[in-house]
Amino acid sequence: AFDGACLLGDWVEATEIKAWDQVQYQLEINGQVRQAGDTSLLIFSIAELLLDISQSFSLQPGDVVMTGTPAGVGALQPNDQLKMTLKGQSQDFVWSTCVKA
C-alpha cells in the first residue's frame, strides 16, 4: 500500500444493474483501452463469489469486494488521464480522473 492507492469512485447501486453476469467494463488511459472485461467471463459468478466470501466474513452494506483485474494493468504516470466505463443493461456509468503530478 502507498499514499493514494486504491482510490474508489462514486458508487453504482446494486439495483442499477439488472444482470450482473452481463456487465462489460473498460479502462482507458490517455485515450487508449488498457483493460476490458466482461462479467460473463469470470470463473465464478458474482453471486458465487459473494456466497463464498460470506461463509468466512460478515458482509455489510457498503462493503467493497476486490477480486483482481483483467490483463493490461500497469504503472501510471503523472498527468495520465483515466476513464472507466461500466456498461449496464439500461445505461453506462462513466468515471474520469487524472493522476496528480
Question: PLM features: residue spans?
Answer:
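Catalytic-pocket segment enriched in acidic/His residues
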Residues: 1-101
